[in-house]
Amino acid sequence: MSNKVHLGHTARKRFGQNFLTDENVINRIVGAISPDNDHVMVEIGPGLAALTEPVASGIDKLIVVELDKDLVERLQTHPVLKDKLEIHQGDALKFDFNQLVREDKQMKVFGNLPYNISTPLMFHLFEFAQHIENMHFMLQKEVVLRLSASPGTKAYGRLTVMAQYHCQVMPVLEVPPGCFTPPPKVDSAVVRLVPYKNKPWPCKDVDLLRNLTTTAFNMRRKTLRNNLKQLLSDEDFAELGIDATLRPEQIRVDQYVAMANHVFDKK
């Protein structure tokens, strides 16, 4: 049997499917998620239910978002899960997570995410951060390093700034390729993201912050002065107390927020 086949399902490359099969890793992730009935529990990409089954076993209801129609059908007929699941068949990148919000409950979101959509999905989920208690995701290790990076490091970039603006970021564990079927070509890791209830550095326009950081990191080897010359003058940098000769990866999250707020105030 091909190593792409697990529990009778052939992994689809276009969906980025790698199914988690290591019981020890699964148990550690479920422990980190800490499922309960006090939150709206949401899984993205349940796949063959490696996390779905142990999470659902201890709660009354689990909401899942799955793109693959074949996997949706498996879940709908699952002997144990079918009565506990609320299944949404569709693309998580386009899914409106606000529809899952309950007045008295925050969401806990988790999943073994397809690596080919992990970065855009992070940006999509940040839009709903005010309704999320925490998130636990299996990601490519490189993406977890980018999420948790410090200024001045190679991994520090646009994703770092936006993730750390919205959330506390904590790596949980590293997961080698042998824990999956089929094994991915890269190492994986689990990350915990806890959205701030009160942002340490409030931003007046988050879209502006996102656009400014994208512009700043478009050319990493060039200086802030060069990359942001359409937005900020030397006088602006001086007023902010930011050295315009620095490169984008040398600037802290709070400094990016200060720059975005300054541009907003100039409008």
Curated annotation (Swiss-Prot):
Keyword Methyltransferase among record annotations: yes
The keyword Methyltransferase belongs to this UniProt entry's keyword annotation: yes
SUPFAM superfamilies for this protein: S-adenosyl-L-methionine-dependent methyltransferases
Enzyme class: transferase
Keywords attached to this entry: Cytoplasm, Methyltransferase, RNA-binding, rRNA processing, S-adenosyl-L-methionine, Transferase
Upper taxonomic lineage: Bacteria, Pseudomonadati, Pseudomonadota, Gammaproteobacteria, Alteromonadales
Subcellular location: Cytoplasm
Family, as annotated: Belongs to the class I-like SAM-binding methyltransferase superfamily. rRNA adenine N(6)-methyltransferase family. RsmA subfamily.
Superkingdom classification of source: Bacteria
One function term, GO molecular function aspect: RNA binding
Biological role: Specifically dimethylates two adjacent adenosines (A1518 and A1519) in the loop of a conserved hairpin near the 3'-end of 16S rRNA in the 30S particle. May play a critical role in biogenesis of 30S subunits.
Gene (name only): rsmA
Enzyme Commission number(s): 2.1.1.182
GO CC annotation: cytosol
UniProt source species: Shewanella halifaxensis (strain HAW-EB4)
Protein name: Ribosomal RNA small subunit methyltransferase A
Catalytic activity: adenosine(1518)/adenosine(1519) in 16S rRNA + 4 S-adenosyl-L-methionine = N(6)-dimethyladenosine(1518)/N(6)-dimethyladenosine(1519) in 16S rRNA + 4 S-adenosyl-L-homocysteine + 4 H(+)
HAMAP family with a match to the protein in the record: 16SrRNA_methyltr_A (MF_00607)
